Amino acid sequence: MSETTTIAAAGTTTQPRFAAFNAAGNAVALGAEDHVITRDTSTGLEYTAAGQRGDYLEHDPAMQACTAVAIAGGGWRAPTRAELIAITDITRHAPAIDAEAFPFVSDDWYWSSDLTAWSSSSAWGVYFNYGGVDGAHRGDDGFALAVRRAGQ
């Protein structure tokens, strides 16, 4: 079952943490066949429900793949380290992410847009097998999720 988040507005209500949308931007059930966008209702960010298809990518091509996403109007970019950490769930394993909200994310390395402080040749990422966060050489291979502010 997917997480819930308590949101205080005019009183307190409980709503699902994640919501799913199809390529046209219409709401669908989490995990539906046409679920391609996952909205984090606690942050207002939307993520692609899957990483790029196919082979692993080095950091720069992964960043380019994120900005090339054209689902539901575009406006996509690579996530920051903090944005990837925000969707990581260390109570889960292989993958360490809500698999209902992100049904096509594998338990592998996903790049962030943030470079490490110790070297511009390295960038941060999350290993969704167990939720580890680390820096890796930008020539190493990984996957990418794209992110944007909801409503773009």
Language model features with spans:
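Glycine-aromatic-enriched surface loops/turns that form tight recognition elements
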Residues: 1-77, 81-152
